[in-house]
């Protein structure tokens, strides 16, 4: 199925804590899918990284471990407990081990995860594709493609024909695929979770062993026959020929159509993100503390110097520098930021936008 970028999935986000969206937020999303795959009952976890990939030497320092542990516990990427997630994992009675070994999948950001409890053992392979985005590429030896933007139902079975016939006549779905292997299952992508009464009927079928329900982890879902009003600058200008809309209005149109949500909801989501960005600026300017970073808090001193008119003139530039620094210091102290879409540059977009807007006295609307 054709997919297109979403502003909230791919650009303005994720909302998170930690040094890297492609490590912290992505690993947390992968682990939340793992949690659903195990019906939230996890006892032991084996996490494997390839020695030639990027994660073998960075999984701890860049926050992959932290994100994984939080995801296994069902947390959000902005949960205030994340920096202590390893201790919370132990308290929950979940054991883990990390192994560096050669993997079949050669993508540099590959996670191979084996999960067990008293009843079952499942294996999942996923990759972090950047900016907090992910793709699950293998479950129990079967090739799949899950981006975390659908409700996914996996029906493990020995024969699929009668089950698929029943599903096609009974439920609304976007795609049904049968993955045949040692652990065969039917994968259903849909806009909503399959109703419990239908799942109960399916469980009674003789060829069905069990069913797994996996929730979406992205803020904006995909769908069958997805359309967008434009995808290039030329298409945007053509779309706007008879509308005369400003860029922000075109962005609202795009995300509303892309996400199948109302323009009002697009605005509400963006206002919530704006508030998080503003809070990060204010928090950073008050001063932040964190033991494990090279430089301490410098934004408050910059603010004092700015307010005392001791900087070379240039209100927009000086405010932008101050705001970017404040947000980056919040990021490095494990505060909540909007990655937009990388945590390593999370101060850039809001720093410039808010620095300019505040300098020319524009409100947040």
Language-model region placement:
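Generic N-terminal targeting/processing segments that precede catalytic cores or assembly contacts
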Residues: 2-135, 140-331
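Glycine/serine-rich anion-binding loops at beta->alpha junctions
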Residues: 14-27, 332-354
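Alpha-helix capping at helix-to-loop junctions
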Residues: 326-333, 358, 362
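Phosphate/pyrophosphate-binding betaalpha-module
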Residues: 349-365
């Amino acid at each position: 199925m054709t997919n297109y970028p979403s502003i909230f999935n791919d650009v303005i986000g994720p909302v998170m804590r930690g040094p890297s969206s492609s490590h912290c937020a992505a690993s947390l999303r992968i682990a939340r899918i793992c949690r659903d795959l195990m019906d939230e009952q996890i006892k032991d976890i084996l996490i494997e990284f390839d020695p030639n990939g990027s994660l073998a030497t960075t999984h701890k320092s860049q926050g992959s471990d932290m994100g994984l542990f939080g995801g296994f516990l069902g947390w959000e990427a902005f949960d205030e407990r994340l920096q202590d997630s390893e201790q919370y994992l132990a308290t929950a009675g979940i054991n883990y081990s990390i192994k560096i070994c050669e993997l079949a999948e050669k993508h540099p950001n590959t996670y191979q995860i084996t999960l067990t409890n008293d009843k079952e053992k499942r294996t999942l392979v996923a990759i972090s594709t950047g900016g907090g985005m992910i793709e699950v590429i293998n479950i129990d030896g079967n090739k799949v493609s899950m981006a975390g933007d659908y409700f996914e139902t996996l029906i493990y079975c020995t024969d699929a024909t009668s089950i698929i016939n029943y599903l096609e006549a009974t439920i609304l779905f976007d795609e049904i695929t049968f993955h045949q292997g040692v652990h065969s299952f039917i994968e259903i992508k849909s806009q909503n979770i399959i109703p419990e009464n239908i799942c109960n009927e399916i469980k009674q079928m003789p060829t069905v062993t069990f069913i797994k329900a996996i929730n979406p982890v992205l803020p904006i879902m995909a769908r069958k026959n997805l359309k967008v009003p434009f995808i290039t600058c030329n298409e945007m200008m053509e779309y706007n020929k008879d509308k005369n809309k400003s860029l922000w209005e075109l962005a609202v149109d795009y995300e509303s159509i892309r996400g199948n949500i109302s323009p009002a909801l697009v605005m509400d989501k963006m206002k919530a993100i704006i508030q998080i960005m503003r809070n990060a600026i204010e928090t950073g300017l008050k001063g932040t503390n964190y033991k494990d970073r090279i430089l301490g808090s410098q934004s408050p001193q910059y603010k004092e110097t700015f307010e005392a008119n001791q900087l070379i003139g240039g209100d927009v530039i000086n405010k932008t520098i101050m705001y970017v620094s404040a947000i980056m210091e919040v990021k490095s102290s494990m505060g909540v930021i909007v990655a937009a879409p990388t945590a390593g540059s999370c101060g850039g977009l809001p720093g410039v936008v808010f620095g300019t807007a505040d300098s020319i006295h524009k409100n947040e609307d």
